[in-house]
Amino acid sequence: MTAKYLVSPRGGRRAYRDITSALRAAEVRGRAALIEIAPGHYEEALTVRGEVRLVAAEGPGTVLVSRPRGAVLDAFGTVSVHGLTLAGRGAGMDIVGCHTGSLTLDRTEVRAHDGVAVHARPHTSVTLRDSVVLYGRTVFTGSAGLAERCRFTDAADNAIAALEGARVTVRGSRIEGSRIHGLRVCDAYAEITGCEVTGTGQAAVVADTRGELAVVECAISATHAEGIMFIEQSRGSVDRTRVTDALHGVVTKSGAGPVVRGSVFADCRDTGINVQDAGLGTFEHCRVLGARNVAVFSTKGGAPELRDCHVSGGNVGIAVTDGGRGRFTRVVVEDLTGTALRVYDEGGAAFSHVRVERCPAGLEARGNGGTTAEVTDSVFRDIDMGAVAIDGQSRVTLRNVTAERGGMVGFTVAGEAMLQITDSDITGVSSGGIGALGSGRLVARNVTVTGSEGLGVYGTGTAYVDVTDSTFTDCALAGASFDEKAAGRLADCAVDGTGALAVRHNGLVDLTALRTSLPVVRHKEKPAGPPPQVVQILSDPVFNGPVFNGPVHDVQLAWNNDHVVQQQTEGDGTHP
């Protein structure tokens, strides 16, 4: 049976003037206690032992318990607090601490002007319901925790921290204005569901040091840094969550590998999905909208895998750089102001069933021989400049790739790079279908170019072009053109339609089994120039001087001298 105690600052019959006196009486009796507290301000520190309920008799906000310095409530046992306001300050102090057993804060407000607001110590359990925590952080250390329908405002540190094996659940709550993180999980487990997190100074939600974090149906906005971050071999999941106006939507690095599903990263100020420093991650059915710099970024050993994702608006779609890797399957990239797919500087990417539409450039690859990209079963449509352009020493393979209304060019290679194309189609380009420039190497098998306003295939510089079993139809200027010292072969190919020429070549390309009714022409050889002028200098013991093979004018000569000083005096302009 529960014993009931009344507390009133005015005293009265069977009423205690302070809460501490009622707690002492309850401890002496050793029974479960209900302590009802009349409205007022109680300046005292409460140490609660046993099974005790502290209740504001006239509802939340009517009872204030505070101290100018130090802890306000220390709980040992099974303690619940209903409707009280607990306020205190003190660096390094726990304003409310659960030392043993369990503590429940229901419709309670905790103000921690300095230090920790609520601390659940190891092997304890703390529950907050419909409560408010102001200024201080709520810490779960090796304990169990639950926060439902709470508000955590303006924490000077992390709003909520789960540490050292803690298991914490946060539901339906709002976290706002934290100077560091909204929720930090360090070597612990936390689940945050249906929450709003906004205005944090650093990552809104973060897992580190092998922590495990589950984020479900949350709204994260206006963070100064990352929306969600997994680092230091942490793991977990993000489901049906929206991140808006973060520097980076979600970041994973240093061995972390979350699974992110059905989430949206909108209007991020730098990147939407950022995987770096050996980070991992699987992203399914996600959308990145309006990323200011790069929508999906893999760098420095990062290795994400994206499936069924959508990138729309913003600058660059997917960028894999500086040794990053990535696999991208059934991804749509559209309506960008920059490049859709970028692979630079030893990056390695595999794109499968990717669709790129309405972008200035499709795929760009540039870097040394360790820079590679593979594109299969993909479509580039309405690209302003070129569907695929590679440079440096990079290596790119295209299989069953289509470029429709591809802008200026379809697929081109330059520098010392190598481009291999198989079973692919290009339609509606303005300059050329496939081509090699500089010292680039182009190998194409079963490629079709239709309706080019310029050329079907071309080579310039010292490029090498090897094209077999391909068809070039209705290419306005020529089906194939080879200039300068470009070399290679055109074997078992067909040039047909209404173009002006089948092939215009320089004599360095092997034309084998070419099927065409259009003319094949060779560039005219440039006429030989005049022989170089030679000036002979004869030197022997008898004579040492120049020999002239014709008239010479306006020269200055000196020989047999160890030192020569040349002076020139300007005349009056009357002599040549």
Where are these regions (language model features)?
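Beta-strand repeat architectures
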Residues: 23-33, 59, 75-79
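Extracellular beta-strand repeat scaffolds in secreted/surface proteins
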Residues: 33-37, 54-56, 492
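Right-handed parallel beta-helix/beta-solenoid
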Residues: 1-24, 28
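Extracellular beta-strand-rich solenoid/capping regions of secreted or surface-exposed proteins
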Residues: 42-55, 63-103, 114-123
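Long, low-complexity intrinsically disordered regions enriched in small/polar
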Residues: 500-576
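Right-handed parallel beta-helix
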Residues: 58, 80-88, 102-112, 125-136, ...
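Extended, small-residue-rich solenoid/repeat segments and analogous flexible loops
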Residues: 64, 106, 129-130, 239, ...
